């Protein structure tokens, strides 16, 4: 019989957010099975034009071969030491992901944690890598900021689920920029699109917003691929405590926003803590800069919290997590809430046992909370065990990551016809004035570039 924790966790790790069952599913259109899934179509570009790509679609980020660069860093980050200069073969990291549901529900924290999560993905590439600069894209329905904008009057104002488009554009851009400012990563470019349309009794609009966080970074070619875990590797968590934050984010974000009660949806939104993430990053950076990197593998804590992050670390061999070693900031948390909360700004690492003390010293110097919470076992099971020996979660790895039921999307082609716009040459100046008022036209810096470029000056844009 499954426990409450196992049922709850299974809903998260098998959500569309985590497993891409629709994205990787089979489409049957007009009775004809399509040759490729959406995911396969995207991967095809890399398959046919690999160029200098080293890793894609199998890690937190994609890596492409970079130039040889000169690294200036301390020889030993666990103590005061001399800086040394050495050449490293670099790789360039690229990443982009959406954070639509959280930004729709609570735009400031939704966009802030979208940027923060994307940064952590670049931190978690291979055995660790370094973020440099970020991007952000926002898409909403018309914001209706001023009167006298006729294109915004075609559709009536709806009963918005949580925030108006105007509030979302302001708060989301503030949130993404706030995280960049506090973490120390410039947002160097981005875009914004607002759109609504009605024709043939069909209505279009970004009522559920799109917030796309992206970025670029770099790492060493030595560390661009994850290592294989072996029995006895230590499971380490670096970052903040567990709280009742972000519960069910993976599953809730995989369905239509508004399907669940506002209490459930608001509880599924994470909260941002850029300072804690910077501390965790400083540890990752330090380990990557040293002559020998003790990290076997690394993942970030995002959707489904500990259970998703740590299970991915030990997927090849299994692992046991001691719940008494997990930091709990709220003593009222249940077992499932400890296991699967999405308190942000945490990284999970597999560390060679003999290097634990060295990593601990680095973490202490960076004021980054570090916890050795378990180890790999080799029994191909993944379990969380309480101090009294009870295991609220204990499943075979195969049960967690085995092949999900194949998803089939059956549909038919719908022919749509749209009228060509009608223009009057005498109104050319009026048309031009209106077009230039659209948020999607011209420079977007007023919305996207609120992060101080001095943090990593000179920035990549410079």
Give the residues covered by each predicted segment.
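Glycine/proline-enriched, intrinsically flexible loops and inter-domain linkers
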Residues: 1-457, 461
């Amino acid at each position: 019989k499954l426990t409450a924790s196992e049922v709850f966790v299974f809903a998260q790790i098998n959500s569309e957010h985590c497993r891409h069952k629709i994205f990787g599913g089979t489409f049957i259109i007009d009775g004809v099975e399509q040759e490729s899934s959406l995911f396969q179509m995207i991967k095809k570009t890399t398959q046919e034009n690999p160029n200098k790509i080293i890793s894609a679609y199998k890690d937190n980020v994609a890596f492409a071969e970079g130039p040889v660069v000169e690294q200036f860093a301390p020889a030993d980050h666990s103590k005061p030491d001399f800086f040394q200069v050495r050449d490293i073969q670099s790789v360039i990291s690229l990443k982009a992901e959406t954070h639509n549901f959280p930004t729709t529900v609570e735009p400031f924290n939704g966009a802030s944690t979208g940027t923060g999560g994307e940064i952590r993905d670049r931190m978690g590439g291979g055995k660790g890598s370094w973020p440099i600069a970020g991007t952000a894209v926002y898409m909403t329905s018309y914001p209706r900021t001023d009167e006298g904008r006729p294109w915004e009057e075609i559709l009536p104002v709806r009963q918005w689920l949580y925030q108006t488009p105007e509030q979302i554009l302001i708060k989301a851009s503030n949130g993404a920029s706030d995280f960049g400012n506090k973490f120390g990563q410039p947002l160097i470019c981005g875009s914004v699109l607002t759109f609504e349309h009605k024709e043939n009794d069909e209505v279009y609009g970004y009522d559920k917003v799109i917030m796309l966080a992206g970025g670029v970074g770099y790492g060493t070619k030595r560390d661009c691929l994850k290592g294989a875990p072996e029995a006895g590797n230590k499971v380490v968590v670096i970052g903040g405590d567990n709280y009742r934050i972000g519960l069910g984010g993976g599953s809730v974000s995989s369905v239509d926003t508004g399907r669940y009660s506002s209490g459930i949806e608001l509880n599924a939104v994470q909260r941002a803590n850029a300072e804690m993430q910077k501390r965790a990053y400083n540890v990752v950076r330090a380990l990557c800069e040293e002559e020998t990197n003790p990290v076997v593998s690394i993942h970030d804590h995002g959707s489904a919290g500990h259970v998703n992050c740590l299970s991915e670390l030990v997927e090849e061999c299994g692992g046991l997590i001691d719940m008494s070693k997990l930091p709990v900031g709220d003593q009222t948390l249940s077992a499932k809430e400890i296991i699967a909360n999405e308190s942000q700004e945490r990284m999970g690492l597999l560390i060679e046992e003999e290097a634990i003390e060295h990593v601990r010293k680095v973490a202490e110097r960076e004021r980054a909370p570090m916890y050795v919470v378990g180890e790999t076992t080799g029994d191909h099971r993944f379990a969380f065990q309480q101090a009294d020996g009870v295991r609220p979660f204990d499943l075979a790895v195969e049960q967690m990551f085995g092949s999900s039921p194949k998803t089939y999307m059956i549909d038919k082609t719908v022919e749509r016809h749209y009228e060509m716009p009608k223009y009057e040459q005498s109104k050319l100046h009026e048309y031009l004035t209106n077009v230039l008022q659209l948020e999607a036209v011209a420079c977007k810096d007023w919305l996207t570039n609120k992060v101080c470029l001095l943090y990593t000056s000179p920035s990549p844009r410079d």
